[in-house]
Amino acid sequence: MENISNLNKIEFISSLNKIRVESSKLLPINNSFIRFDLLNLVMLHELEGEELSFKRLYSSVNHSDIGLRNHLMKLKDDGWISINESKKDARSKIITATDKLHRTYERLSEALRKNS
C-alpha cells in the first residue's frame, strides 16, 4: 500500500467497514470469518456456474474441517445453503445457495451501493 495516498487508504478501509457492517446486518455470520468465507465461496461458485464440493471447499479456505462442517450444517439447517448429491459424481456432495441466500446477497449489494 506504499503507493496509495492516505485518502485512498481511508476510502479503502471505510469500504471494508461498510461491507462488514452491512454483512453483519443481513447475513448470519455472527462475527465469524468462517461463516463469512463460506457464504461468499458458495455464492462465488454458484455465480461462476461451478459446483462446490466438500473437497473443493476444504481446499479453498484456511479453517479447520470440524469448524467448517459445524457451520455448514447450521447454515443448511437455517435454510441458507443446501447440500445435495452431485449430478456428475454420486459420491460427491455439492453445496449450493438457496433462494434465501440469493435474495440476501441482492439486498446486501443494494445496501452497499446506497452507502457508497
Protein language model features and the residues they cover:
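N-terminal leader segment of winged-helix/HTH proteins
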Residues: 1-29
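Amphipathic alpha-helical dimerization/coiled-coil segments
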Residues: 8, 20-23, 106-116
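Charged/polar positions within long, soluble alpha-helices
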Residues: 43, 73, 77-80, 106, ...
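A short secondary-structure junction motif
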Residues: 16-20, 45, 78
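Short, cationic-aromatic polyanion-contact patches
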Residues: 34, 86-109
